């Protein structure tokens, strides 16, 4: 749809959104892309970095209370970013599993883009991950996890700012991984986090 092409063009003009497939290839394997989260433009940057043939079968995960709280936002994210929504509060979810829309999407053979930190982070190193991706991995152990490190977006459009600084963003796609047999939640979440950190360019210093 034209709105998707417009958002991608805007992302490329403003931040670059250059893809670097450093540990994986842009193939048709079903995947869950997990990335560090530093700004509102992160989702568009990853979306723009994916080839169009993968976008058709990939869905961005969006918070219902923020991205679907008015008709325009919902139209924009549904038609522009192929969004699937999760209801984070018990009141919105009406007692249902908030991950059910993601289970349904994966069960249909589609892929997801998700930010496991759950909130934006000012630092270059991701915060500890929320448990949602562990539950996805347990239910769909055959689905690849692809760590993605968004480089420079914390400086291009930091939390609290509304206009980007003119720097180039790179989306670095790292090595695929799966939930290992017998691996517990904490170990998996930390391994996933380290996968995102490892996808960074070598010159980026560790914390």
Regions found by a protein language model. Name each.
Residues 75, 111, 122-186:
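A cross-family acyltransferase "interaction/gating" segment
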Residues 63-67, 118, 149-154:
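Short beta-alpha junction loops
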Residues 5-37:
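Helix-to-loop junction immediately C-terminal to a conserved catalytic motif
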Residues 27-90:
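Catalytic core of membrane glycerolipid acyltransferases/transacylases, capturing the structured
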Residues 1-16, 74-78, 82:
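Short hydrophobic helices that act as membrane-entry/anchoring signals
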Residues 17, 56-58, 110, 143:
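A structural micro-motif
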Residues 25, 42, 48, 68-69, ...:
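N-terminal/domain-start segments enriched in small and hydrophobic, helix-friendly residues
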Residues 14-19, 90-99:
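Glycine-rich, highly charged phosphate/nucleotide-binding loops
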């Amino acid at each position: 749809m034209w709105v998707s092409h417009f958002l991608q063009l805007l992302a490329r003009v403003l931040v670059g959104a250059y893809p670097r497939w450093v540990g994986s290839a842009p193939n048709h394997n079903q995947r869950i892309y997990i990335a560090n989260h530093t700004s509102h433009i992160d989702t568009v940057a990853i979306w723009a970095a994916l080839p169009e043939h993968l976008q058709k079968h990939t869905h961005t995960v969006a918070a219902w209370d923020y991205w679907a709280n008015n008709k325009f936002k919902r139209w924009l994210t549904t038609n522009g970013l192929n969004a699937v929504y999760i209801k984070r509060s018990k009141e919105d979810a009406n007692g249902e599993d908030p991950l059910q829309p993601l289970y349904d999407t994966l069960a249909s053979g589609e892929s997801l883009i998700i930010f496991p930190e759950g909130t934006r982070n000012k630092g270059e190193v991701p915060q500890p991950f929320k448990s949602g991706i562990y539950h996805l991995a347990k239910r769909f152990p055959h689905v690849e996890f692809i760590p993605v490190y968004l480089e420079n977006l914390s400086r291009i459009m930091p939390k609290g700012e509304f206009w980007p600084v003119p720097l180039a963003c790179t989306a670095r796609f790292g090595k695929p991984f799966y939930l290992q047999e017998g691996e517990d939640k904490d170990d998996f979440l930390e391994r996933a986090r380290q996968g995102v950190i490892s996808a960074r360019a070598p010159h980026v210093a560790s914390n």
